[in-house]
């Protein structure tokens, strides 16, 4: 294990975090929020000291960097980012309990959007900004940001890190160099964010609100800056957010292909077509089920479309209390929470690509049972899928199910209902945000015990990092062997 290389890398990640805290510190100065502003000063100072120590201890690090280091580095980096990222909330005492501050920022970086806050609007503006920015940074990935804007280092450095942090069953190159791929993804991501801000400003949303909302939308994080999330905003602003949530649930590679003029490749993409089909089907079924629930058809369609978009993209904004909807509609929403967005997007969940591969693999197994001598390949977009990817998908599904049920049992010690516990785990592990009943869109996670909050923090990080970069931190083999 190349510990020195990992230490230097974590120092770079912390440096980026410290730099990104500067705008929040400036906002604290502008708004005269003295206590909150100084909390950022102390945090940045703590980061600077830690970075200095790591750089001194890790001088002369070997350049070799392999898959195991990549996975471990990603897992540790996100934990360290969260430990330092929560300090402004805790030092300012705006979130007095450290575990609550840690839960809040883990929810931010993992783009979950679950909160322990009873009154979001009581937070200082600079802390609201940092809270919202955390899930924008976590959306595409802080490590992807580092790869996009620094040089390549060491053997396999970029590929191992991008593979470990990127969502989906496989990491593909848009261009030959992985650094260039990371740069393209971030440029598209920034462009989507700016475009989202512009459309929100056209709807007369205040600039601060527009920026924070765009962070939550493009990062599919869903931290609202108002206690009612998006409910108090105009229908236009809600519709704009619906569109951008759905767009950010699409594989970002599709946008690169669009920029290259490869429209046919985009429209023939099987995952995209399945994603669109699921979205449209869910909206139609929920609208039919909600007949008479709202005053007008327009309101019904708007809330149905927004809620479908917020859950399948794993954003977590809300315009209505969907916990009051009929059971059929809530069942559809739970299915969307499980499926999630497309691979290569900023969304969470199992991913549409994995669902597609699992269904095709199941179909192949049925055919082979009926015709044992028949050789049949699983194909995606006309190309054969590597058997290793199928095996990894099956392993991911097994780990996915096990973690959900173990977490469900563990947090059940708090005595909440089965629905509350199950949807709380689904919301955190799939990076959704709200669940049902006691963790519904008008509630929060503050009532859970410290132990349950730690379990849910594990779920949020494991869900965002596709399980294994977090899971391997708890295995002996990771630390015993070279």
State where each predicted segment sits.
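Membrane-proximal intracellular helices of multi-pass ion channels
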Residues: 1-482
